[in-house]
Design a protein with these regions (language model features):
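Surface-exposed, low-hydrophobicity beta-strand/loop segments enriched in small/polar/acidic residues
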Residues: 1-177
Length: 177
């Protein structure tokens, strides 16, 4: 029977820190503009020129990954916490919780077969919008972009997830910084 990896992209999932420092999984708070584009859990985040955060794009400087949002619902006026932000949200107090520690390690699915020999290379992301009902990111590591030059992510290992750790097989999960 051939070894396969589950094809289940999930964006940049924080999994711990590099080295022996404290791993408190702390999140920083950043403002998000009303009626912003949809942002899903684990989407890569970047800072816009407005000082608000938005979904990261390929080749942009990434701030971290979204862990959730808080806002006062414009219709019900109730405080609301969610793992994502709908594009149609008109709240004026939206705050995003971002895993942004520079020592944070993330797990991300590769969009092709990543081999152990490619650990240490750099690559950008390839964006795909998240989906309902879970509102989790579908962003993946752009395998075709692997290089020694500067990029958004550096591959530092292959995941230990038993459903996605078969190196050299499509959809393997990589550990990145």
């Amino acid at each position: 029977m051939a070894i396969t990896n589950a094809d289940n992209a999930f964006g940049l999932r924080a999994i711990g820190k590099v080295g022996q420092n404290r791993d408190n999984q702390g999140l920083s708070e950043y403002g998000i503009a009303a009626s912003s584009a949809a942002i899903y859990q684990n989407d890569p985040i970047m800072m816009a020129a407005t000082g608000k955060i938005i979904v990261g794009t390929a080749a942009a400087v990434l701030l971290g990954s979204l862990n959730g949002v808080f806002f006062t619902d414009a219709t019900t006026e109730k405080p609301t916490y969610a793992n994502h932000l709908n594009a149609s949200n008109t709240a004026t107090d939206i705050v995003g919780f971002v895993s942004d520690d520079p020592y944070e390690r993330f797990e991300i699915q590769s969009d092709a077969a990543l081999t152990a020999a490619e650990v240490g290379l750099n690559a950008d992301i390839v964006y795909a919008a998240g989906a309902t009902p879970n509102y989790v990111s579908k962003v993946e590591l752009d395998h075709s972009d692997l290089k020694t030059a500067i990029a958004q992510l550096r591959v530092i290992g292959i995941s230990k997830d038993p459903q996605n750790n078969a190196a050299g097989v499509a959809n393997v999960n990589a550990v990145v910084i």
